[in-house]
From Swiss-Prot:
Located at the top of the head of the 30S subunit, it contacts several helices of the 16S rRNA. In the 70S ribosome it contacts the 23S rRNA (bridge B1a) and protein L5 of the 50S subunit (bridge B1b), connecting the 2 subunits; these bridges are implicated in subunit movement. Contacts the tRNAs in the A and P-sites. It comes from Leptothrix cholodnii (strain ATCC 51168 / LMG 8142 / SP-6). It comes from the Bacteria. GO terms for cellular component: cytosol; small ribosomal subunit. Belongs to the universal ribosomal protein uS13 family. Part of the 30S ribosomal subunit. Forms a loose heterodimer with protein S19. Forms two bridges to the 50S subunit in the 70S ribosome. InterPro entries: Rbsml_uS13_C, Ribosomal_uS13, Ribosomal_uS13-like_H2TH, Ribosomal_uS13_bac-type, Ribosomal_uS13_CS. Keywords: Ribonucleoprotein, Ribosomal protein, RNA-binding, rRNA-binding, tRNA-binding. This is Small ribosomal subunit protein uS13. Pfam families: Ribosomal_S13. GO terms for molecular function: rRNA binding; structural constituent of ribosome; tRNA binding. Residues 94-121 are annotated as: Disordered. HAMAP family: Ribosomal_uS13 (MF_01315).
Amino acid sequence: MARIAGINIPPHKHAEIGLTSIYGVGRTTAQKICEACGIAYNKKVKDLDDSDLEKIREEVGRLTIEGDLRREISINIKRLMDLGCYRGFRHRRGLPVRGQRTRTNSRTRKGPKKGAAALKK
């Protein structure tokens, strides 16, 4: 099993798809990594040799991924909340941030419906 950036890459998947198991690496980034390393997208992870894996590790090392990316995102959200701007206010209240309607829908952000009795108390 290949281990890149502290993540086990599934050996039965293609290199492009396997790389997406790393937080912060999507399909496009995975394709760019494979291209930079000279590896075919459709090559299985188990078929990659050590030199290929080392090239991939080097490319992935240049990116902001996993814990660093999560930390950066949380710091950015905290900064918005500290500023008191509209987006920060929406984050703080747990409401949609990007202008979606809230009269109906937005149940994912707002959580399950509260009954009329719960609102009166």
